[in-house]
Amino acid sequence: MGKFLATLILFFQFCPLILGDYSPSCCTLTVGVSSYHSKPCNPAQPVCSWTLDLLALSADQALQPPCPNLVSYSSYHATYSLYLFPHWIKKPNRNGGGYYSASYSDPCSLKCPYLGCQSWTCPYTGAVSSPYWKFQQDVNFTQEVSHLNINLHFSKCGFSFSLLVDAPGYDPIWFLNTEPSQLPPTAPPLLSHSNLDHILEPSIPWKSKLLTLVQLTLQSTNYTCIVCIDRASLSTWHVLYSPNVSVPSPSSTPLLYPSLALPAPHLTLPFNWTHCFDPQIQAIVSSPCHNSLILPPFSLSPVPTLGSRSRRAVPVAVWLVSALAMGAGVAGRITGSMSLASGKSLLHEVDKDISQLTQAIVKNHKNLLKIAQYAAQNRRGLDLLFWEQGGLCKALQEQCCFLNITNSHVSILQERPPLENRVLTGWGLNWDLGLSQWAREALQTGITLVALLLLVILAGPCILRQLRHLPSRVRYPHYSLINPESSL
């Protein structure tokens, strides 16, 4: 038996190594400034899937475009089908006879060629059927109007791929990076019919930048402030920008109109600026000038200082209120005792009435039984008279009627205990002690007063101490928001 238990323990210790210890993980897809977590996937569950909104992807790519002056997906007047180009597969050169053609050089004449064209030939963008790798084993996708479903094998998580539009003359619009990661506690919200709301949950680099900025702000205030970050819509987001960096003229398409823009000419960040802010139109634009940083609204509040403790005498009002409370309790107890006494007498009278009603019902029941016996005798006599005609019922040509009188309800009524025994009065204790009614009530009142006195002696000091500290707790320090017009 001992050898069996030892073998079983060793098996459970090495079982995770044999079967594989796959912690919950996923594949994170990064587009521009936002990250999208796939459904749970690992080597044991190798399919990583996403459901993406093409308009949201365009907004992500526009905030941090890999190429200047790209035509966004939202600018199209019709829905075109897409091509998915994995970067771990080299495109075949079909020499102009198939899906991809090196002779079609118009898309490659752009200053920023198609993403991945450094190692590939340029893709063909004519009207063709399904792309070559739409149904590959490692990656496949389906497109439903403005929504995209991508399935990726976990072994290929860590590579990048491109999405292009099947329309001549349009630029590539999406460059997707993937990397393995752990599942977040809650998925970032993806709101439909909105271009930028999904970046309310920043990706991991954005969170680290925000924490670094908060750390820098606290250092500048000698850690005497509390930082509060508000979750709000993008219309209330703030922008921190450097007026020393010029914006190219004319500016590109406006992407975001913040509610507040703070210039920071003397602020040195531990990281680079991420976006381009145009002060003339008060908007984030698509130009790659990198002079601003988008932040959720946050406020600085002074840290409250602890006041000195002062010992005070207990106010007279506290003693007065305590005495009034004890007097009210004693008066209430006496009134309750008198009410209980009158209630007991009332129960006794009601019990007598119920007993008399029960006796009357029993007598009526006995009379009913005698009447039933008399009717049965008459029935038997009439049946003998009409014996030749088959009995009384056949002679009258009617259905025979019988009496069914039960004694169960009357017996239950007689067996019920007295009403005084069924209703709890006083404390619910059966203590007669050979005393009269008023003596028992006085004894209960005395025990109640002693219990209240012990409760006041035990809990009184604690209650008085809490009441003494109550005025100091009511006075809260005043918190003021950061001045929007002050320079950082």
Swiss-Prot record:
Between which residues do disulfide bridges form? C225-C228, C225-C401, C393-C400
> Post-translational modification, briefly?
Specific enzymatic cleavages in vivo yield mature proteins. Envelope glycoproteins are synthesized as an inactive precursor that is N-glycosylated and processed likely by host cell furin or by a furin-like protease in the Golgi to yield the mature SU and TM proteins. The cleavage site between SU and TM requires the minimal sequence [KR]-X-[KR]-R. The CXXC motif is highly conserved across a broad range of retroviral envelope proteins. It is thought to participate in the formation of a labile disulfide bond possibly with the CX6CC motif present in the transmembrane protein. Isomerization of the intersubunit disulfide bond to an SU intrachain disulfide bond is thought to occur upon receptor recognition in order to allow membrane fusion.
Q: Where is this site: Cleavage?
A: R312, A313
Which residue spans traverse the membrane? 443-463
Say if the entry is tagged with keyword Repeat. no
Q: Where is this region: Immunosuppression?
A: 376-392
Residues in a coiled coil are 341-387, 397-429
Enumerate the Pfam families for this protein. TLV_coat
Q: Which residues lie on this side of the membrane: Extracellular?
A: 21-442
Instruction: Outline the segment boundaries, as ranges, of region: Fusion peptide.
Output: 313-333
**Domain of life from the UniProt record:** Viruses
Signal peptide segment: 1-20
Q: Which GO terms describe its biological process?
A: fusion of virus membrane with host plasma membrane; symbiont entry into host cell; virion attachment to host cell
Q: Which GO terms describe its cellular component?
A: host cell plasma membrane; membrane; viral envelope; virion membrane
What keywords tag this UniProt record? Cleavage on pair of basic residues, Coiled coil, Disulfide bond, Fusion of virus membrane with host cell membrane, Fusion of virus membrane with host membrane, Glycoprotein, Host cell membrane, Host membrane, Host-virus interaction, Lipoprotein, Membrane, Palmitate, Signal, Transmembrane, Transmembrane helix, Viral attachment to host cell, Viral envelope protein, Viral penetration into host cytoplasm, Virion, Virus entry into host cell
Query: Sugar-bearing residues?
Result: N140, N222, N244, N272, N404
- The UniProt entry annotates the motif CX6CC at 393-401
Positions on the Cytoplasmic side per record topology = 464-488
Please give the InterPro entries that the UniProt record associates with this protein.
TLV/ENV_coat_polyprotein
In which residues does the motif CXXC occur?
A: 225-228
Q: Where is the lipid attached (S-palmitoyl cysteine)?
A: C462
Give the protein's biological function: The surface protein (SU) attaches the virus to the host cell by binding to its receptor. This interaction triggers the refolding of the transmembrane protein (TM) and is thought to activate its fusogenic potential by unmasking its fusion peptide. Fusion occurs at the host cell plasma membrane.
Q: What else is known?
A: HTLV-1 lineages are divided in four clades, A (Cosmopolitan), B (Central African group), C (Melanesian group) and D (New Central African group).
What binding partners and quaternary form does the record give? The mature envelope protein (Env) consists of a trimer of SU-TM heterodimers attached by a labile interchain disulfide bond.
Please provide the record's free-text comment about the domains of this protein.
The 17 amino acids long immunosuppressive region is present in many retroviral envelope proteins. Synthetic peptides derived from this relatively conserved sequence inhibit immune function in vitro and in vivo.
Q: What is this protein called?
A: Envelope glycoprotein gp62
Q: Which organism is it from?
A: Human T-cell leukemia virus 1 (isolate Caribbea HS-35 subtype A) (HTLV-1)
**Gene of this entry:** env
